[in-house]
Protein backbone atom coordinates (compact mmCIF):
# COMPACT_ATOMS: atom_id res chain seq x y z
CA UNK A 1 0.00 0.00 0.00
CA UNK A 2 1.35 3.41 -0.91
CA UNK A 3 2.17 5.66 1.99
CA UNK A 4 1.43 9.29 1.33
CA UNK A 5 1.09 12.22 3.66
CA UNK A 6 -0.74 15.22 2.27
CA UNK A 7 0.95 18.54 2.83
CA UNK A 8 -0.69 21.83 3.64
CA UNK A 9 0.67 25.14 2.48
CA UNK A 10 2.98 26.89 4.89
CA UNK A 11 3.02 30.62 5.43
CA UNK A 12 5.41 32.59 3.23
CA UNK A 13 7.89 33.10 6.08
CA UNK A 14 7.92 29.37 6.87
CA UNK A 15 8.90 28.23 3.38
CA UNK A 16 12.24 26.45 3.07
CA UNK A 17 14.39 24.87 0.38
CA UNK A 18 12.36 21.65 0.52
CA UNK A 19 9.05 23.37 -0.23
CA UNK A 20 8.58 23.02 -3.98
CA UNK A 21 7.20 26.55 -4.40
CA UNK A 22 10.33 28.15 -2.90
CA UNK A 23 12.63 25.56 -4.45
CA UNK A 24 11.43 26.33 -7.95
CA UNK A 25 11.31 30.09 -7.34
CA UNK A 26 14.88 30.40 -6.06
CA UNK A 27 16.50 27.85 -8.35
CA UNK A 28 14.85 29.23 -11.49
CA UNK A 29 16.09 32.73 -10.63
CA UNK A 30 19.62 31.45 -10.07
CA UNK A 31 20.63 29.00 -12.83
CA UNK A 32 24.10 28.84 -11.28
CA UNK A 33 22.52 27.01 -8.33
CA UNK A 34 21.08 24.40 -10.69
CA UNK A 35 24.43 23.94 -12.38
CA UNK A 36 26.24 23.56 -9.05
CA UNK A 37 23.66 21.12 -7.70
CA UNK A 38 24.04 18.96 -10.80
CA UNK A 39 27.80 19.00 -10.42
CA UNK A 40 27.57 17.95 -6.77
CA UNK A 41 25.15 15.10 -7.44
CA UNK A 42 26.69 13.84 -10.68
CA UNK A 43 30.30 14.55 -9.61
CA UNK A 44 31.12 15.91 -13.04
CA UNK A 45 31.71 19.31 -14.58
CA UNK A 46 28.51 20.59 -16.19
CA UNK A 47 28.82 23.09 -18.99
CA UNK A 48 26.34 25.90 -19.51
CA UNK A 49 22.69 25.06 -18.94
CA UNK A 50 19.53 26.60 -20.32
CA UNK A 51 15.88 26.20 -19.44
CA UNK A 52 13.97 23.90 -21.74
CA UNK A 53 11.03 25.83 -23.22
CA UNK A 54 8.52 23.00 -23.40
CA UNK A 55 5.89 23.58 -20.74
CA UNK A 56 3.07 24.00 -23.26
CA UNK A 57 3.99 20.76 -25.00
CA UNK A 58 4.30 18.92 -21.72
CA UNK A 59 0.85 20.00 -20.62
CA UNK A 60 -0.61 18.79 -23.88
CA UNK A 61 1.06 15.38 -23.80
CA UNK A 62 -0.90 12.22 -23.10
CA UNK A 63 -4.32 13.71 -23.87
CA UNK A 64 -3.75 16.58 -21.50
CA UNK A 65 -2.54 14.35 -18.67
CA UNK A 66 0.94 15.81 -18.83
CA UNK A 67 3.07 17.16 -16.03
CA UNK A 68 4.81 20.43 -15.26
CA UNK A 69 8.40 19.85 -14.23
CA UNK A 70 9.97 21.85 -11.38
CA UNK A 71 13.30 22.44 -13.12
CA UNK A 72 13.67 21.20 -16.70
CA UNK A 73 17.01 22.19 -18.19
CA UNK A 74 19.38 21.22 -20.97
CA UNK A 75 23.15 21.54 -21.06
CA UNK A 76 25.47 22.38 -23.93
CA UNK A 77 25.96 18.66 -24.61
CA UNK A 78 22.20 18.30 -25.27
CA UNK A 79 21.60 16.27 -22.12
CA UNK A 80 18.25 17.10 -20.54
CA UNK A 81 17.71 17.15 -16.80
CA UNK A 82 14.64 17.20 -14.62
CA UNK A 83 15.19 18.12 -10.98
CA UNK A 84 12.20 17.68 -8.69
CA UNK A 85 11.72 18.44 -5.00
CA UNK A 86 9.39 15.78 -3.64
CA UNK A 87 7.01 17.28 -1.09
CA UNK A 88 4.72 14.32 -0.41
CA UNK A 89 6.04 11.25 1.36
CA UNK A 90 5.83 8.49 -1.23
CA UNK A 91 6.40 4.78 -0.88
CA UNK A 92 9.41 3.48 -2.78
CA UNK A 93 7.13 1.79 -5.29
CA UNK A 94 5.09 4.93 -5.92
CA UNK A 95 8.22 7.04 -6.34
CA UNK A 96 9.73 4.58 -8.80
CA UNK A 97 6.53 4.49 -10.86
CA UNK A 98 6.46 8.27 -10.86
CA UNK A 99 9.97 8.34 -12.30
CA UNK A 100 8.89 5.87 -14.97
CA UNK A 101 6.01 8.17 -15.94
CA UNK A 102 8.33 11.19 -16.10
CA UNK A 103 10.69 9.27 -18.36
CA UNK A 104 7.85 8.62 -20.78
CA UNK A 105 7.01 12.33 -20.85
CA UNK A 106 10.67 13.14 -21.44
CA UNK A 107 10.90 10.82 -24.41
CA UNK A 108 7.68 11.97 -26.07
CA UNK A 109 8.60 15.61 -25.57
CA UNK A 110 12.16 15.42 -26.86
CA UNK A 111 11.14 14.26 -30.34
CA UNK A 112 9.41 16.39 -32.92
CA UNK A 113 6.68 14.84 -35.04
CA UNK A 114 8.16 12.41 -37.54
CA UNK A 115 11.61 12.29 -35.95
CA UNK A 116 13.37 8.97 -35.42
CA UNK A 117 13.60 7.55 -31.90
CA UNK A 118 17.37 7.38 -32.47
CA UNK A 119 17.37 11.15 -31.91
CA UNK A 120 16.18 10.78 -28.31
CA UNK A 121 18.38 12.89 -26.07
CA UNK A 122 20.31 11.65 -23.08
CA UNK A 123 18.17 12.29 -20.01
CA UNK A 124 18.73 12.39 -16.26
CA UNK A 125 15.86 12.58 -13.78
CA UNK A 126 16.73 13.65 -10.24
CA UNK A 127 14.30 13.47 -7.32
CA UNK A 128 15.26 15.28 -4.10
CA UNK A 129 13.50 13.51 -1.24
CA UNK A 130 13.46 14.62 2.42
CA UNK A 131 12.40 11.10 3.39
CA UNK A 132 13.72 7.54 3.19
CA UNK A 133 13.80 5.52 -0.03
CA UNK A 134 14.18 1.72 -0.06
CA UNK A 135 14.25 1.62 3.75
CA UNK A 136 16.85 4.37 3.95
CA UNK A 137 19.80 2.23 2.93
CA UNK A 138 21.50 5.12 1.12
CA UNK A 139 21.42 8.87 0.63
CA UNK A 140 22.26 8.70 -3.07
CA UNK A 141 20.85 6.17 -5.53
CA UNK A 142 21.78 6.14 -9.21
CA UNK A 143 19.88 3.78 -11.49
CA UNK A 144 20.73 2.58 -14.99
CA UNK A 145 19.54 -0.50 -16.88
CA UNK A 146 21.87 -3.50 -16.77
CA UNK A 147 21.66 -7.02 -18.19
CA UNK A 148 20.56 -9.48 -15.49
CA UNK A 149 22.68 -12.25 -17.00
CA UNK A 150 25.80 -10.09 -17.24
CA UNK A 151 25.76 -6.99 -15.06
CA UNK A 152 28.84 -5.63 -16.78
CA UNK A 153 26.57 -4.90 -19.76
CA UNK A 154 24.77 -1.56 -19.69
CA UNK A 155 21.71 -0.98 -21.86
CA UNK A 156 22.79 2.08 -23.91
CA UNK A 157 19.43 3.86 -23.73
CA UNK A 158 21.10 6.94 -22.20
CA UNK A 159 18.61 7.26 -19.35
CA UNK A 160 19.58 7.75 -15.73
CA UNK A 161 17.38 8.09 -12.67
CA UNK A 162 18.78 9.49 -9.44
CA UNK A 163 17.22 9.74 -6.00
CA UNK A 164 18.78 11.96 -3.34
CA UNK A 165 17.34 10.93 0.02
CA UNK A 166 18.35 13.26 2.84
CA UNK A 167 16.92 10.84 5.44
CA UNK A 168 18.94 7.90 4.13
CA UNK A 169 22.19 6.50 5.49
CA UNK A 170 25.40 8.35 4.69
CA UNK A 171 27.42 5.61 3.03
CA UNK A 172 31.20 5.84 2.43
CA UNK A 173 30.58 6.70 -1.23
CA UNK A 174 28.28 9.63 -0.44
CA UNK A 175 29.93 12.65 -2.14
CA UNK A 176 31.39 14.95 0.51
CA UNK A 177 29.97 18.02 -1.20
CA UNK A 178 26.50 16.48 -1.05
CA UNK A 179 26.47 16.07 2.74
CA UNK A 180 25.83 19.78 3.50
CA UNK A 181 22.96 19.70 0.99
CA UNK A 182 21.47 16.66 2.73
CA UNK A 183 21.81 18.39 6.10
CA UNK A 184 20.19 21.54 4.71
CA UNK A 185 17.30 19.49 3.34
CA UNK A 186 16.86 18.06 6.84
CA UNK A 187 16.40 21.52 8.30
CA UNK A 188 19.90 22.08 9.61
CA UNK A 189 21.69 25.40 9.18
CA UNK A 190 23.50 26.00 5.91
CA UNK A 191 27.12 24.93 6.37
CA UNK A 192 28.74 25.08 2.92
CA UNK A 193 29.28 28.01 0.58
CA UNK A 194 26.67 26.51 -1.74
CA UNK A 195 23.93 26.01 0.86
CA UNK A 196 24.71 29.39 2.42
CA UNK A 197 24.22 31.04 -0.98
CA UNK A 198 20.87 29.29 -1.41
CA UNK A 199 19.82 30.23 2.12
CA UNK A 200 20.71 33.86 1.52
CA UNK A 201 18.75 33.85 -1.75
CA UNK A 202 15.69 32.47 0.05
CA UNK A 203 15.94 35.19 2.70
CA UNK A 204 16.09 37.83 -0.02
CA UNK A 205 13.03 36.38 -1.77
CA UNK A 206 11.07 36.57 1.47
CA UNK A 207 11.74 40.32 1.59
CA UNK A 208 10.38 40.90 -1.91
CA UNK A 209 6.83 42.08 -1.38
CA UNK A 210 5.63 41.18 -4.87
CA UNK A 211 6.76 37.58 -4.36
CA UNK A 212 5.05 37.46 -0.98
CA UNK A 213 1.82 38.70 -2.53
CA UNK A 214 2.10 36.20 -5.38
CA UNK A 215 2.38 33.38 -2.89
CA UNK A 216 -0.49 34.68 -0.78
CA UNK A 217 -2.66 34.82 -3.90
CA UNK A 218 -1.61 31.29 -4.80
CA UNK A 219 -2.33 30.13 -1.24
CA UNK A 220 -5.75 31.78 -1.19
CA UNK A 221 -6.79 30.34 -4.54
CA UNK A 222 -5.62 26.89 -3.55
CA UNK A 223 -7.60 27.02 -0.32
CA UNK A 224 -10.67 28.18 -2.23
CA UNK A 225 -10.31 25.27 -4.62
CA UNK A 226 -9.84 22.81 -1.75
CA UNK A 227 -12.98 24.14 -0.08
CA UNK A 228 -14.78 23.94 -3.40
CA UNK A 229 -13.71 20.33 -3.76
CA UNK A 230 -14.89 19.45 -0.27
CA UNK A 231 -18.30 21.03 -0.79
CA UNK A 232 -18.57 19.60 -4.29
CA UNK A 233 -17.75 16.17 -2.94
CA UNK A 234 -20.51 16.43 -0.35
CA UNK A 235 -23.13 17.29 -2.95
CA UNK A 236 -21.98 15.34 -6.00
CA UNK A 237 -20.17 12.42 -4.43
CA UNK A 238 -16.56 12.12 -3.34
CA UNK A 239 -15.00 11.11 -6.67
CA UNK A 240 -17.05 13.49 -8.81
CA UNK A 241 -16.32 16.38 -6.47
CA UNK A 242 -12.59 15.74 -6.54
CA UNK A 243 -12.60 15.49 -10.33
CA UNK A 244 -14.20 18.92 -10.52
CA UNK A 245 -11.70 20.27 -7.99
CA UNK A 246 -8.75 18.93 -9.97
CA UNK A 247 -10.03 20.68 -13.07
CA UNK A 248 -10.56 23.93 -11.17
CA UNK A 249 -7.03 23.86 -9.72
CA UNK A 250 -5.59 23.21 -13.17
CA UNK A 251 -7.54 26.11 -14.69
CA UNK A 252 -7.15 28.68 -11.93
CA UNK A 253 -3.67 27.95 -10.58
CA UNK A 254 -2.11 26.49 -13.72
CA UNK A 255 -1.23 23.31 -11.84
CA UNK A 256 -0.45 20.00 -13.48
CA UNK A 257 -3.03 17.24 -12.83
CA UNK A 258 -0.54 15.55 -10.52
CA UNK A 259 0.09 18.61 -8.35
CA UNK A 260 -3.62 19.37 -8.24
CA UNK A 261 -4.31 15.86 -6.98
CA UNK A 262 -1.51 16.17 -4.44
CA UNK A 263 -2.98 19.44 -3.14
CA UNK A 264 -6.32 17.70 -2.66
CA UNK A 265 -4.78 14.88 -0.65
CA UNK A 266 -5.28 12.19 -3.26
CA UNK A 267 -2.82 9.32 -2.76
CA UNK A 268 -0.36 8.62 -5.61
CA UNK A 269 -1.80 5.12 -5.94
CA UNK A 270 -5.07 6.77 -7.01
CA UNK A 271 -3.56 9.17 -9.55
CA UNK A 272 -4.09 6.94 -12.58
CA UNK A 273 -7.73 6.40 -11.63
CA UNK A 274 -8.46 10.12 -11.44
CA UNK A 275 -6.44 10.89 -14.57
CA UNK A 276 -8.60 8.48 -16.53
CA UNK A 277 -11.69 10.40 -15.41
CA UNK A 278 -10.50 13.91 -16.28
Predicted regions and their residues:
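Conserved single-residue anchors adjacent to enzymatic active/cofactor-binding motifs
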Residues: 1-210
Amino acid sequence: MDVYTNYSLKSWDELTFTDDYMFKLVMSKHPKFIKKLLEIILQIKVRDIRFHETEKNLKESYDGHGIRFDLYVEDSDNTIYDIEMQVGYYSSNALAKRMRFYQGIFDVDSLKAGQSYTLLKKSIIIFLCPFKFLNGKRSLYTFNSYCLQDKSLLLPDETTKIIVSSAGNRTPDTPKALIPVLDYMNGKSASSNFTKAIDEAIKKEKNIETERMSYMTYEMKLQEMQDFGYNKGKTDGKVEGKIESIKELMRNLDLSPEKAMKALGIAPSEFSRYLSLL
